[in-house]
Amino acid sequence: MFPDNKNFETWSTRELINYVLEYHHPIGRRRGHVLRNQARTTLETAGAQRHIVEKIVEQLEISIPDLDSHFDREEAVLFPYLIELCTAEENKQRIEAFHCGTILNPIHVMMNEHAMEQDRYGYLETLTDNFTAPAEATEEYRNLLADLKTFV
């Protein structure tokens, strides 16, 4: 299904797209929703870290729907056209121009979205001292930070 190595730089465009569609997006969606629910639940037992958990929840309430929307646009707009380009190249054919001018337009938008999410998770990393729980933290808070670090 996928190459044995995880050196993505050696993968073909088609292999990368398939990996994202079959693995990265489904797992990202599932983990994102689980993490957001976990953060909401952790609010109940956060104790001294409640103010931090509130900010984590606030950011995840924005991030997870944004990620879902981003994934949807990649799946509906970007990837189908890239697959069409790959097929045309393999068959040495030409295809019609992208419907909104150039494929670079949605790519730039999506790259900006990636940068915004990186900033958001950078903020959470700083807020949580690199996802490190203080000694007195609850087990739920420790688990939330560990899962958030894995998600990022």
Task: Locate predicted features.
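Small-residue-biased structural context
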Residues: 1-152
